[in-house]
Design a protein with these regions (language model features):
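Transmembrane alpha-helices of multi-pass inner-membrane enzymes
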Residues: 91-103, 107-134
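Short glycine-rich loop/turn motifs that provide flexible caps or phosphate-binding loops at active sites
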Residues: 18-20, 59-62, 113, 121
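Short, flexible micro-motifs
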Residues: 22-26, 63-66, 109, 117, ...
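Domain-wide signal for the mature, well-folded portions of proteins, strongly enriched
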Residues: 9, 29, 48, 52-53, ...
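Hydrophobic transmembrane alpha-helices and their immediate junctions
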Residues: 35, 58-99
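Long extracytoplasmic/lumenal interhelical loops at the membrane interface
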Residues: 2-14, 18-59
Length: 134
């Protein structure tokens, strides 16, 4: 994924504040000669294959910062609520695993990966609120 990440970072540097637009990665990669030439070993991908790089490339700094604030607010909610400590720890470990920053991922925007991710995130929030053992 090295070529994809380098291309993504170049796209971000060209549009740092607002990004290239949501779901525009593949379109811009295929239709911009400079970007297409950066993909030597692979064809243009549909997305950058990392959720943080995707938000940075497609949404710019604004969207990446909002996404990180969103994740921290969920983690803060789980830590502060009065649920069972064991379930809170399980929820936090699951979230940390799902949103590990250096992991290759699917797109959160346009495929099943996003549906599953946000479903599991909701389950983790609910699980962390249980006060007694199940």
């Amino acid at each position: 994924y090295g070529e994809i990440y380098v291309l993504s970072f170049k796209m971000f540097l060209d549009n740092p504040i607002t990004g290239i637009g949501i779901n525009n990665f593949k379109y811009l990669c295929n239709n911009n000669k400079q970007y297409k030439n950066m993909m030597v070993n692979y064809n243009c991908a549909s997305h950058p294959h990392n959720i943080y790089i995707q938000w940075l490339t497609e949404g710019g700094l604004i969207v990446l910062i909002l996404f990180i604030i969103y994740l921290f607010s969920i983690v803060g909610f789980i830590i502060k609520n009065e649920g069972n400590k064991k379930y809170k720890i399980i929820s936090l470990v699951i979230i940390l695993t799902m949103f590990w920053p250096i992991m290759s991922t699917g797109s959160l925007i346009k495929n099943w990966y996003g549906i599953i991710t946000f479903f599991i995130l909701g389950i983790c929030v609910c699980l962390s609120r249980f006060k007694n053992n199940l």
